[in-house]
From Swiss-Prot:
CDD domains assigned to the protein according to its UniProt record, in alphabetical order: beta_tubulin (cd02187)
Residues that, per the record, bind GTP: Q11, E69, S138, G142, T143, G144, N204, N226
Disulfide bonds: none
Organism name: Oryza sativa subsp. japonica (Rice)
Protein known as: Tubulin beta-1 chain
Length: 447
């Protein structure tokens, strides 16, 4: 019941995805061959959210893995949990997208997309009541961004009423992998605004900062970064997979977090994050978790929530704790930092509590916030985009694949509209909304 279909695309998506499956398998007590080796019945109660049970009692992830080159797939297949996936669900091309959005979206990706959709359809038919899709990808490359957004729009056509949740890794401000990242990211955001329901915005630089500052790792690897992401990913869906006092699912999350349909880009955070050495000196309490999860240093994308205001936020706690205490802490946060919340959305912090904590912790929490400060990310990408686009730099890579300059202009203006929408709601006050209502009320009296 309430299954989620997981899709990972491109190198980044596949690496995050494989880490995520390690975490989920661990939580449900499933070993790398797909056998159940857990100890608690709760692990099996709703294991079917992410797993199909095969005839021989093995659990097979509901995962579709796609890429335009075989390299990353091979490393997933040889990785610790490589044998657990259904072999038919690996869909890959040979040519690669070469960090080119147009190749992923229009040429190479378009040739492969039908075979990916067949696998998705097959998995969806195996579900009892499909809740939605979660997609892992990056927006800077070619496959995750170009083909990822193509797949999202195709799935949107075929399953219009299912939730579409994405974990999107944005290009970092200071660390750039390729020069055309701003192009790829802008073209992708253009698609995500229209076709996704909820986007969790991640960014390598912010994740590096968390590893350096909070976890005190001297040389963080991508594995460490992906581990942070997968902790958050499993936190978002823990309410579906384990019993809890206040449940939430993807749709409830959307209802509570998205006041206006286009503004669905969220910041995420996770607590407790402590360095290995200092772990034993910290008490895990609800106030302690709350304080860390609202901390700006804890956000997994390079935007500072103190520069904007929260439209809405959601806190998902895991572990044995009293709901009363959780509610008190949430009200406390809102009262103390009231200037950081818009006053025209009442009760804009939603909390949920799930009884089963992650492995090795007594309690943990996942934070998802819809903050207007996320516009910093879009602004930054947009500036880099404009700097290149007005000189038409590197455009021939895209026009050569059959794209039109018009598409770039459209994507650019869509992103700028998004930024100004966030700005508009950041500046909006309750009085303005009030005046508007008064005018409406006066109309009948004049008649």
């Amino acid at each position: 019941m309430r299954e989620i279909l997981h899709i990972q695309g491109g190198q980044c998506g596949n690496q995050i995805g494989s880490k995520f499956w390690e975490v989920v398998c661990d939580e449900h007590g499933i070993d790398p061959t797909g056998r159940y080796v857990g100890t608690s019945d709760l692990q099996l109660e709703r294991v079917n959210v992410y797993y199909n049970e095969a005839s021989c009692g093995r659990f097979v992830p509901r995962a579709v893995l796609m890429d335009l080159e075989p390299g990353t797939m091979d490393s997933v297949r040889t990785g610790p949990y490589g044998q657990i996936f259904r072999p038919d669900n690996f869909v890959f091309g040979q040519s690669g997208a070469g960090n080119n959005w147009a190749k992923g979206h229009y040429t190479e990706g378009a040739e492969l997309i039908d075979s990916v959709l067949d696998v998705v359809r097959k998995e969806a038919e195996n579900c009892d009541c499909l809740q939605g899709f979660q997609v892992c990808h990056s927006l800077g490359g070619g496959t995750g961004s170009g083909m990822g957004t193509l797949l999202i729009s195709k799935i949107r056509e075929e399953y219009p009423d299912r939730m579409m949740l994405t974990f999107s890794v944005f290009p970092s401000p200071k660390v750039s992998d390729t020069v055309v990242e701003p192009y790829n990211a802008t073209l992708s955001v253009h698609q995500l605004v229209e076709n996704a329901d909820e986007c969790m915005v991640l960014d390598n630089e912010a994740l590096y900062d968390i590893c350096f500052r909070t976890l005190k790792l001297t040389t963080p690897s991508f594995g460490d970064l992906n581990h942070l992401i997968s902790a958050t990913m499993s936190g978002v869906t823990c309410c579906l997979r384990f019993p809890g006092q206040l449940n939430s699912d993807l749709r409830k999350l959307a209802v509570n977090l998205i006041p206006f349909p286009r503004l669905h880009f969220f910041m995420v955070g996770f607590a407790p994050l402590t360095s290995r050495g200092s772990q034993q000196y910290r008490a895990l309490t609800v106030p302690e978790l709350t304080q860390q999860m609202w901390d700006a240093k804890n956000m997994m994308c390079a935007a500072d929530p103190r520069h904007g205001r929260y439209l809405t936020a959601s806190a998902m706690f895991r572990g044995k704790m009293s709901t009363k205490e959780v509610d008190e802490q949430m009200i406390n946060v809102q009262n103390k930092n009231s200037s950081y919340f818009v006053e025209w959305i009442p009760n804009n912090v939603k909390s949920s509590v799930c009884d089963i904590p992650p492995r090795g912790l007594s309690m943990a929490s996942t934070f998802i916030g819809n903050s207007t400060s996320i516009q910093e990310m879009f602004r930054r990408v947009s500036e880099q985009f404009t700097a290149m686009f007005r000189r038409k730099a590197f455009l021939h890579w895209y026009t050569g694949e059959g794209m039109d300059e018009m598409e770039f202009t459209e994507a650019e203006s869509n992103m700028n509209d998004l930024v100004s929408e966030y700005q508009q709601y950041q500046d909006a006050t309750a009085d303005e909304e009030g005046d508007y209502e008064d005018e409406e009320e006066q109309v009948p009296e004049d008649e």
